[in-house]
């Protein structure tokens, strides 16, 4: 058998000051009637002159008026010593120290100063003998001041009038529950005069439950948390000591003579024939406690309308064993005792007669025996020992090991702040101050039992059963975890899909973003238009430079063409910069990263390596969808631009001039400065109603691309998505080598220009760049081969040769 663990402990003393009752508040003296009332006295005497009126007494100090002066002083003493109301005699400094009968509120201090002033006034006409009388008076005054002065007490805990039931329980009883489950006995008892709140602290009310109900609730919660590791057996008893007789509150029909206190060889105090009950839930405990409180003896007195006339003792016995089957069985047992003592009484205050007087005498006798035991325990230090009168009362016999034995004890002392309980409060504080000196030696109540060889087969069977239970429990836990994980993943998937759908609906339904996409498409369309115009201008420059006969006279035209070509180049570059700028379209994706992503990361089972990759892939495909829509719309705009006669003539002016030689080439070049206004009038039709300008084919392409967003999650788990960038390339403007013209090529002039204009815009290629360099281009749309050379100059040269002939 293992040696029990032993620890040193001491009684924890907590003071609780009850608030004033409604009746006491009506009689409470107003201490703060002015600044002078709150100013503390410094202890020095007042100045006084002979033959003058005293401001306090208005009595002329004269030998002839001695009788009048003495009567006036007597009335003054009676007025101050015996106030009409009550006063507060307890001040809580902090959570540990209190001041009993503070000096600034003690009326005796004020009376002594007045008496001293009168005595010193009479001593002014006396001789040397009167000086000795003055010294005697000072000594008397100091004795009075010292006798009626304030007293400071320091305890383990202090609760003022505003402390709640929950706070009192948490700081006094709650720490004992872990000790009880660890195998140490614990006791909580409330001590104090009648009407000070002991029963309220222990039992409470339905709206403000006391420590019994709060302790039982927390105890069963702790037992529930440990039920997988240990088996618990709980028993409960509830008794009262009334007129030195024990009554079973849960079985009141049991005669008191049969309930006898016994002490076994293991120093355990038990009551023979007391009923023990075995509650399974905290509700069962509450029902038993309520039943016992109904059977408890209470009677109205002058001091308390519902005065407890007995000491109530509630004991909860807890035995626990380990569920793990071993060769040695560990048993741990402990007892939690909660005791509500009856209040000490004064016959004059309670005005009890007959039976109530007899009850009060027995209560005081048992409390006196308790006080004697506390005094004796305080005298039992290491150097001396004395007899402790536990057998003077049945109460002290029950509290024998709670006070000086194997038990952790908390003493909740309830006091009244009213001056009407002056003596009871002072005596209670003195007893509590002595009780905190008591030392106890607590021992863990644990017992180890070795199993017999014959029980090994039973132990093996029990272990197999436990193994099967653990396996089933593990399977259930795994199944629950997997189910929970799947549900969380489904929630994450739904949240991501909702976020993606919201982005798609924003792009498709908000007019601001539709206009922004239309502007992007118009930028590409205008860029393509300016490139074709610039191509015609550059071809005209080459044509005039290679024609030696007309080079000199056409020099002003060449100069204007070069100026216009440079301006067109700058405008194309400006459009490319405008297209690459951050606009409202990118703000939607940015909002997802800055706001929605943070909310998604707060969801349970969010995985950065899986869920974030899936979200980024969806957002990238939405961005790709918007770029594809812009490209498709730009191609549609370009096709409509080809059918516009005015704009079409701007990039075919060279071929028309070569065929007709009219109008003058200088006027054609001058008219090129109006291409911005002409293109703006063309673009207004798309800005005014962007949706009606695109065909159903475009919408079908967009919907088909949107359907591609449903990418299987497995394919995205290890896929890296790099940032998309736009690579701008200009079409090859180098002229073709001069070849002898062929007559059959003449009809191809307009066909070649139309083919150039109708090409899908491939000058902007969407190429993927990563840290290692450019990779294979993404192909949201069908790739179109780039033209290496422009063939329109061949037709131009053949026409010139034919004209010379």
From Swiss-Prot:
Per UniProt, the keywords (alphabetical) are: ATP-binding, Coiled coil, Cytoplasm, Cytoskeleton, Microtubule, Motor protein, Nucleotide-binding
Annotated positions binding ATP:
192-199
PROSITE patterns linked: KINESIN_MOTOR_1 (PS00411), KINESIN_MOTOR_2 (PS50067)
**Is the keyword Iron in the record?**
no
- Domain of life according to the entry: Eukaryota
Alphabetical list of CDD domains matching this protein:
KISc_KIP3_like (cd01370)
GO MF annotation terms: ATP binding; ATP hydrolysis activity; microtubule binding; plus-end-directed microtubule motor activity; tubulin-dependent ATPase activity
Q: Which GO cellular component terms are attached?
A: cytoplasm; cytoplasmic microtubule; kinesin complex; microtubule plus-end; mitotic spindle astral microtubule; mitotic spindle midzone; nuclear microtubule; nucleus
Q: Does the keyword Phosphoprotein apply?
A: no
**Which segments show compositional bias classed as Low complexity?**
774-783
- Name where it mostly resides: cytoplasm
- Domain Kinesin motor spans what residues? 10-438
Residues folding into a coiled coil are: 449-481
Polar residues: bias regions: 764-773, 792-805
Location in the cell reads:
Cytoplasm, Cytoskeleton
Q: Spell out the family assignment given in the record's similarity comment.
A: Belongs to the TRAFAC class myosin-kinesin ATPase superfamily. Kinesin family. Kinesin II subfamily.
PANTHER family referenced in this protein's UniProt entry, alphabetically: CENTROMERE PROTEIN E, KINESIN-LIKE PROTEIN KIF19 ISOFORM X1
**Other remarks on record?**
Present with 736 molecules/cell in log phase SD medium.
User: What is this protein called in UniProt?
Assistant: Kinesin-like protein KIP3
């Amino acid at each position: 058998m293992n040696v029990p663990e032993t620890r040193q402990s001491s009684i924890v003393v907590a003071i609780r000051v009850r608030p004033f009752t409604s009746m006491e508040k009506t009689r409470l003296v107003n201490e703060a009637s002015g600044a002078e009332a709150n100013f503390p006295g410094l202890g020095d005497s007042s100045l006084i002159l002979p033959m003058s009126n005293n401001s306090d007494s208005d009595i002329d100090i004269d030998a002839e008026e001695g009788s009048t002066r003495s009567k006036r002083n007597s009335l003054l003493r009676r007025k101050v010593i015996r106030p009409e109301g009550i006063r507060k005699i307890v001040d809580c400094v902090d959570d540990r120290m209190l001041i009993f009968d503070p000096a600034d509120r003690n009326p005796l201090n004020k009376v002594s100063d007045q008496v001293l002033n009168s005595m010193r006034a009479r001593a002014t006409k006396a001789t040397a003998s009167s000086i000795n009388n003055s010294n005697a008076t000072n000594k008397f005054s100091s004795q009075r001041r010292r006798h009626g002065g304030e007293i400071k007490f320091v305890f383990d805990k202090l609760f003022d009038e505003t402390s709640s039931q929950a706070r009192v329980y948490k700081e006094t009883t709650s720490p004992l529950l872990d000790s009880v489950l660890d195998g140490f006995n614990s006791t909580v008892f409330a001590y104090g005069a009648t009407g000070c709140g002991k029963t309220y602290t222990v039992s409470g009310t339905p709206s403000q439950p006391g420590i019994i109900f709060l302790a039982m609730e927390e105890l069963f919660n702790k037992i529930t948390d440990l039920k997988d590791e240990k088996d618990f057996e709980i028993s409960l008893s509830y008794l009262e000591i009334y007129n030195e007789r024990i009554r079973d509150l849960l079985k009141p029909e049991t005669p008191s003579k049969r309930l006898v206190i016994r002490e076994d060889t293991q120093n355990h105090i038990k009551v023979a024939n007391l009923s023990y009950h075995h509650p399974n839930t905290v509700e069962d405990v509450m029902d038993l406690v309520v039943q016992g409180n109904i059977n408890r003896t209470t009677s109205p007195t002058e001091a308390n309308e519902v005065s407890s006339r007995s000491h109530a003792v509630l004991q909860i016995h807890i035995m626990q064993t380990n569920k793990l089957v071993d060769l040695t069985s560990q048993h741990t047992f402990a007892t939690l005792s909660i005791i509500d003592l009856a209040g000490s009484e004064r016959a004059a205050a309670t005005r009890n007669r007959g039976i109530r007087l007899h009850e009060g005498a027995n209560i005081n006798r048992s409390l006196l025996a308790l006080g004697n035991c506390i005094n004796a325990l305080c005298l039992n230090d290491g150097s001396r020992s004395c007899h402790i009168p536990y057998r003077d009362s049945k109460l002290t016999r029950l509290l024998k090991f709670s006070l000086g034995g194997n038990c952790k004890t908390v003493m909740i002392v309830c006091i009244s702040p009213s001056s009407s309980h002056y003596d009871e409060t002072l005596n209670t504080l003195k007893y509590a101050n002595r009780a905190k000196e008591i030392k106890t030696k607590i021992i863990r109540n644990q017992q180890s039992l070795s199993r017999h060889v014959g029980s090994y087969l039973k132990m093996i069977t029990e272990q197999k059963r436990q193994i099967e239970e653990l396996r089933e429990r593990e399977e259930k836990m795994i199944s629950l975890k997997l189910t929970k994980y799947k549900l969380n993943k489904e929630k994450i998937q739904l949240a991501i899909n909702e976020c993606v759908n919201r982005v798609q609906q924003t792009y498709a339904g908000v007019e601001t973003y539709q206009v922004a996409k239309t502007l992007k498409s118009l930028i590409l369309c205008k860029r393509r238009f300016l490139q074709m115009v610039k191509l015609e201008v550059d071809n005209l420059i080459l044509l005039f430079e290679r024609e030696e006969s007309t080079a000199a006279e056409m020099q002003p035209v060449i100069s204007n063409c070069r100026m216009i070509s440079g301006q067109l180049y700058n405008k194309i570059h400006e459009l490319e910069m405008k297209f690459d700028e951050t606009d409202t379209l990118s703000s939607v994706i940015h909002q997802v990263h800055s706001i929605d992503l943070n909310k998604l990361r707060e969801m349970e089972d969010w995985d950065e390596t899986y869920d974030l990759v899936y979200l980024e892939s969806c957002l990238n495909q939405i961005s790709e969808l918007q770029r594809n829509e812009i490209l498709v719309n730009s191609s549609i705009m370009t096709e409509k631009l080809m059918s516009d006669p005015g704009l079409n003539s701007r990039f075919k002016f060279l071929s028309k001039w070569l065929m007709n030689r009219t109008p003058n080439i200088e006027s054609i070049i001058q008219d090129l400065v109006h291409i911005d206004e002409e293109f703006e009038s063309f673009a207004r039709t798309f800005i005014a109603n962007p949706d009606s300008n695109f065909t159903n084919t475009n919408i079908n392409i967009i919907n088909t691309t949107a359907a591609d967003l449903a990418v299987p999650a497995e394919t995205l788990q290890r896929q890296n998505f790099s940032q998309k960038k736009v690579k701008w390339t200009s079409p090859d403007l180098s002229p073709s080598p001069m070849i002898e013209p062929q007559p059959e090529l003449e009809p191809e002039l307009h066909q070649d220009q139309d083919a150039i204009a109708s090409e899908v815009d491939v000058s902007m290629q969407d190429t993927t760049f990563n840290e290692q360099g450019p990779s294979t281009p993404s192909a949201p749309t069908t790739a179109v081969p780039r033209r290496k050379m422009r063939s329109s100059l061949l037709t131009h040269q053949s026409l010139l040769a034919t004209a010379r002939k």
